[in-house]
């Protein structure tokens, strides 16, 4: 292992300690809490704190004159650039772990997140965007940094369980960002929230100090323990180039990028597309769509205990994952049909929840969430299940899965955004006639991109081909739990 001054410092006085479950869970909790903080900070920007140029929110702050505000294409380009930056940061995680150790990579990523504290007080919009990009790179790294902890400290059964809970923190953070803008706290409270956007970002940013201080004190240098270094020296030498040459890396990119579309695009595109499909330019159903998204995200809390239970048992994974993702996308299509043909036609009930069609719409969102969020744990546990898996390999692999997955997700975002809002097209001048062709085209793309995951799964190898196929099980007694 080539050393540098940071790694030299990190390796001083390293005393090997037992890799106990309690220490592993503590480190896991600090990192997932940091990830939830990132999701909250990032989500509030698009959920409502952005406001409108010349009126309120951070857009009103930086552009008191609405005519000076950047156009739609510029805003989209900024978002694409930030997402690409997050992808690059994800790819670099594996390299950083090798160069400066896992503990110092975590601390560095949390330091990046501290830029979220000063970003709201930037004197310029450009500075605000740059500082939030640095913050976002650090935040995105958290979900990858979990994996070496899980891989080192937990046995196979514990990994299967913890993989069910790790995904909880994205929906929890996102639900928190949606609640103030879902019509629950009232219009005046919404406006107060939006007017005090700097304080909201400041408070969330300061929470980053909790995992940062916690990891400085409690973080371990498990990857630098002599026993781990000895194991790594006996293993194959890995680099980013090694994984780029492997076909499985690109199959994972297809799978993970497509799954990201399936779970993130409904949050990003549902409001503008749903409104345009019914010819509503006033956002009349904004609150109801927000509640639909909350139901969708709430599916995460049921999914791991239903859909996600497969990880605990000796059953084949690939076809099961593909079926569940397809079912989740199908529920989204059904929910859209119900909204366009029934819920969105009834303006009298736009702000109420007493009609049956509204509840069908909401519960379809819940079923969609149970499928798409519930399967994440099964999917993310796959790299741990392949023969020859080890903490060193998993760290590299997850960095690439997230980084390249984000890149694929960004490409899908650019294509969908350009179809939804083509450059040079003034949406205000379109004759809607209840169906906006651009919005419908974008929606169809979302469905197609979400289903591409099946291609990635078909190309990947089954990690345990000796496990039984779920459809061939005839009684529960045939299903065996995974042994330690």
UniProtKB/Swiss-Prot annotation:
Transmembrane segments: 19-39, 78-98, 110-130, 134-154, 165-185, 199-219, 249-269, 289-309, 321-341, 360-380, 398-418, 440-460
Main localization, broad class: membrane
Pfam families tied to this protein: MFS_Mycoplasma
Gene3D superfamilies (UniProt xref): MFS general substrate transporter like domains (1.20.1250.20)
GO annotation, cellular component aspect: plasma membrane
Highest taxon of source: Bacteria
Name of the protein this chain belongs to: Uncharacterized protein MHJ_0132
Organism phylogeny: Bacteria, Bacillati, Mycoplasmatota, Mycoplasmoidales, Metamycoplasmataceae
């Amino acid at each position: 292992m080539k050393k540098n001054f940071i790694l030299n410092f990190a390796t001083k006085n390293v005393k090997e300690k037992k890799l106990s479950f309690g220490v592993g869970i503590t480190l896991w909790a600090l990192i997932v809490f940091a990830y939830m903080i990132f999701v909250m900070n990032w989500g509030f920007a698009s959920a409502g704190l952005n406001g409108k140029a010349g009126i309120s929110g951070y857009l009103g702050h930086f552009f008191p004159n609405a005519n000076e505000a950047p156009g739609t294409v510029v805003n989209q380009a900024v978002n694409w650039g930030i997402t690409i930056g997050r992808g690059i940061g994800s790819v670099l995680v594996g390299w950083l772990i090798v160069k400066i150790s896992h503990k110092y990579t975590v601390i560095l990523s949390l330091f990046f997140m501290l830029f979220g504290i000063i970003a709201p007080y930037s004197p310029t919009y450009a500075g605000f965007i740059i500082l939030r990009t640095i913050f976002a790179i650090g935040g995105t790294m958290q979900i990858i940094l979990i994996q070496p902890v899980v891989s080192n400290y937990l046995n196979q059964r514990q990994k299967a369980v913890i993989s069910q809970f790790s995904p909880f923190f994205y929906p929890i953070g996102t639900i928190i960002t949606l609640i103030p803008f879902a019509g629950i706290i009232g219009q005046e409270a919404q406006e107060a929230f939006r007017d005090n956007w700097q304080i909201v970002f400041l408070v969330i940013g300061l929470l980053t100090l909790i995992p940062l201080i916690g990891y400085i004190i409690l973080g371990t240098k498990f990857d630098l323990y002599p026993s781990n270094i000895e194991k790594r020296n006996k293993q194959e030498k890995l680099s980013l180039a090694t994984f780029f040459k492997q076909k499985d890396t690109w199959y994972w990119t297809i799978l993970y990028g497509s799954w990201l579309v399936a779970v993130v695009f409904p949050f990003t595109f549902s409001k503008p597309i749903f409104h345009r499909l019914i010819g509503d330019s006033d956002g009349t159903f904004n609150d109801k769509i927000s509640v639909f998204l909350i139901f969708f995200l709430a599916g995460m809390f049921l999914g791991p205990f239903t859909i996600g239970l497969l990880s605990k048992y000796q059953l084949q994974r690939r076809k099961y994952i593909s079926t569940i993702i397809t079912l989740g996308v199908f529920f989204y299509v059904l929910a859209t049909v119900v909204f366009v043909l029934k819920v969105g036609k009834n303006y009298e009930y736009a702000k109420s929840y007493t009609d049956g069609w509204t509840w069908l719409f909401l519960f379809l969102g819940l079923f969609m969430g149970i499928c798409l969020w519930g399967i994440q744990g099964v999917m993310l546990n796959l790299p741990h299940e392949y023969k020859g898996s080890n903490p060193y390999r998993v760290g590299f692999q997850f960095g690439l899965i997230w980084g390249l997955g984000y890149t694929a997700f960004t490409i899908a975002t650019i294509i969908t955004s350009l179809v939804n809002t083509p450059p040079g097209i003034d949406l205000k001048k379109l004759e809607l006639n209840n169906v906006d062709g651009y919005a419908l085209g974008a929606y169809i793309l979302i469905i197609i991109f979400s289903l591409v995951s099946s291609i990635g799964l078909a190309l990947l190898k089954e990690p345990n081909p000796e496990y039984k196929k779920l459809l061939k099980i005839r009684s529960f007694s045939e299903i065996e739990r995974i042994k330690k």
